[in-house]
Amino acid sequence: MAAKDVKFGNEARIKMLRGVNVLADAVKVTLGPKGRNVVLDKSFGAPSITKDGVSVAREIELEDKFENMGAQMVKEVASKANDAAGDGTTTATLLAQSIVNEGLKAVAAGMNPMDLKRGIDKAVISAVEELKHLSVPCSDSKAITQVGTISANADEKVGSLIAEAMEKVGNDGVITVEEGTGLQDELEVVKGMQFDRGYLSPYFINKPETGIVELENPYILMADKKISNVREMLPILESVAKSGKPLLIISEDLEGEALATLVVNSMRGIVKVAAVKAPGFGDRRKAMLQDISILTGGSVISEELAMELEKSTLEDLGQAKRVVISKDTTTIIGGVGEKHSIQSRISQIRQEIQEATSDYDKEKLNERLAKLSGGVAVLKVGAATEVEMKEKKARVEDALHATRAAVEEGVVAGGGVALVRVAGKIADLRGQNEDQNVGIRVALRAMEAPLRQIVSNSGEEPSVVTNNVKDGKGNYGYNAATDEYGDMIDFGILDPTKVTRSALQYAASVAGLMITTECMVTDLPKEDKSSDSSSSPAGGMGGMGGMM
């Protein structure tokens, strides 16, 4: 086991604080409408330029191991805020830096660290309650546009595109961000349920000019099994042929004579048919087939439920207004499933999302939810260069997370004003002793830090502006973009309540742990033995010089 380097008390805390400040100082220059860019060097390719706090934080590793521990703990604040609300990483980092700096000053002055932490926690709990009272629901398109614009660093085009996407696919709809091919940002909306499976044979194509299969008012057969024997399918094929409607078959796989028979029937015009594989794998495939059956009002033919394909009738089949199948995707539009069945399935998936533990599971469940409830929107980001594209894509993703958070928990006045107002409302809060009171004051002072930094980044004097904002009431604040005072809601400067709340809670949580740190342990650097061996006279194969 490697030998350890151990530091105690003030010596440990000073080192840790130095690391906190290096990381936070790098992150906080990006805050606000006049925040600066940070250039990140890459081991290959062009450097990337960003104004995203968490992207800056992730890049920072310090040489001194004790300082690095401090930096990594603040990085954790940014990551947690990002995971919870998708935005507010810079605010969270700044709040943590302020609490740690003020808290460690108090510890150095002889205060009890545990009481300081209790005071900070008490202030944060009260502040979160006050934030909830200040919060205003965010439901209309204008408010969503404003939130998106602020989070995308005052890019109005991005804000309005996100609002348009949410309007089209609903608040639960999936909105993905992709790199576009042109200079302009574009919005593409896919209505209905789409999954990543294309036709099993190009002979099914009935629109050769576009290379797709289009079926109008088709029956949809869903089978959770491989189909290779054509005899199983004959009864249902005959029933569909009599009805005169087309047929879509979605199964685990379709091969051999079954596929050949379908192709021949389709080409001869006996029955208009197309076949695709079921989406997903394992249990997820079963769940997605069930989703499709509920959406289209049919049943999944499953051997687990003792159902046989030969005995299935037209009543077991789903129906839709239209199905479009390309080489890679299948889109079912206008399923005829019962509304209440679809709603109860949506509620069930929502419940599963709350209980899911892994991010991957949550993402897949959200996709299923969106496909059932509205559709999928794709935001294609346009830019002139690859460097700009990456920077812009990160901003658009931030803005998207922020608008989702705003719809979920509402909005408060932006520009750091909400936290200043909250601090004013709980200024009379008291702890059980003087050390706890100091902890409360540390938290209250930290709540001014975002406003001060926004002002500082815009080149004004933080103390003057902060005092002016404190003297105002309600949503009165400072618009750093235009250098004027007024109502922040009227200015369209809004922050999602969830983002502000998460930033404060995670910052206080990690900062509290750092204030109560008394000892730090890390590995001692290993001595490099290779330098000793290289100085030996023989130097490895050096004695073989005469062999050349």
Swiss-Prot record:
Spans through the membrane: none
SUPFAM superfamilies: GroEL apical domain-like, GroEL equatorial domain-like, GroEL-intermediate domain like
Cellular component aspect of the GO annotation: cytoplasm
Enzyme Commission (EC) number: 5.6.1.7
Residues bound to ATP: 30-33, 51, 87-91, 415, 479-481, 495
Keyword Membrane in record: no
GO molecular function: ATP binding; ATP-dependent protein folding chaperone; isomerase activity; unfolded protein binding
Catalyses which reaction(s): ATP + H2O + a folded polypeptide = ADP + phosphate + an unfolded polypeptide
PANTHER family found in the cross-reference section: 60 KDA HEAT SHOCK PROTEIN, MITOCHONDRIAL (PTHR45633)
Function according to Swiss-Prot or TrEMBL: Together with its co-chaperonin GroES, plays an essential role in assisting protein folding. The GroEL-GroES system forms a nano-cage that allows encapsulation of the non-native substrate proteins and provides a physical environment optimized to promote and accelerate protein folding.
Protein family (similarity comment): Belongs to the chaperonin (HSP60) family.
Identification of the protein by name: Chaperonin GroEL
